Amino acid sequence: MSGMEATVTIPIWQNKPHGAARSVVRRIGTNLPLKPCARASFETLPNISDLCLRDVPPVPTLADIAWIAADEEETYARVRSDTRPLRHTWKPSPLIVMQRNASVPNLRGSEERLLALKKPALPALSRTTELQDELSHLRSQIAKIVAADAASASLTPDFLSPGSSNVSSPLPCFGSSFHSTTSFVISDITEETEVEVPELPSVPLLCSASPECCKPEHKAACSSSEEDDCVSLSKASSFADMMGILKDFHRMKQSQDLNRSLLKEEDPAVLISEVLRRKFALKEEDISRKGN
């Protein structure tokens, strides 16, 4: 009996009878049962053969949560022990299909929704393409201005004098240059509107209108100067178009500068700073006079 009593384990709070009321820890130990909690158990899915299990357990684990959340266009979830064939040929078996937990969010779907919201809308893309087209058109017009320097020499007063023989051909073309200014219009929504320009009268019509051009001695001179006149007049018309655009830009800039100057004059901070500057300037002048 003495050997059996020596092997019995006695808790420390029961070793001394008078020690149970001596500390709070011993009082808690006497009231609470110090037994381990029961372990959580999972039920295996029914009617699953050993061939389907392979090397992985049929019980779902924490690793399946990310797998379930990554599923797309699926209202069900499966354990990792199942094989995943092609999407268009796979049909779930009713024995191994589990109901998907609604509390697990589909993170990939929300990310795709955010990316779709960040994409620019179609009107913005069309507006950008329109702006790019307008910039390219302006660049071509500026290039024509640079090329029109050579045409400015041909449009001298000597060229337009009454005694010159080329007066009959260029005069109708200047009327067309007035109409060609409407071929490029910058509106508030930065769109380009092309207006049909009446075609220039042909050279034979001009020659038929003037009897001097129909003479045989003037035919060679008219044929040689036709190409030069057409090139110079086309350059002059493009130059007139671009000059009108530049004038509009200059007027807009002047109106903006005028509005800014008016706002600057009406700004109270500007008025206060101007008064303080004058006041300190007068004080400095008085101090300099007294020092002298």
UniProtKB/Swiss-Prot annotation:
Segments forming a coiled coil: none
Pfam families listed in its UniProt record: Mito_fiss_reg (PF05308)
Cellular component terms (Gene Ontology): mitochondrial outer membrane; mitochondrion
Topology relative to the membrane: Peripheral membrane protein
Post-translational modification as stated in the protein's UniProt record: Phosphorylated by AMPK. Upon stress, phosphorylation at Ser-103 and Ser-238 by AMPK is sufficient to induce mitochondrial fragmentation.
Location within or outside the cell: Mitochondrion outer membrane
Origin: domain of life: Eukaryota
Keyword field: Membrane, Mitochondrion, Mitochondrion outer membrane, Phosphoprotein
Record PTM Phosphoserine, positions in chain: S41, S103, S110, S224, S225, S238, S261, S273
Residue list for modification Phosphothreonine: T30
Major subcellular site: mitochondrion
GO biological process: aerobic respiration; mitochondrial fission
Function: Mitochondrial protein required for adaptation of miochondrial dynamics to metabolic changes. Regulates mitochondrial morphology at steady state and mediates AMPK-dependent stress-induced mitochondrial fragmentation via the control of OPA1 levels.
Family under the similarity heading: Belongs to the MTFR1 family.
PANTHER family according to UniProt: MITOCHONDRIAL FISSION REGULATOR 1-LIKE (PTHR14215:SF3), PROTEIN OF UNKNOWN FUNCTION DUF729 (PTHR14215)
Name recorded for this polypeptide: Mitochondrial fission regulator 1-like
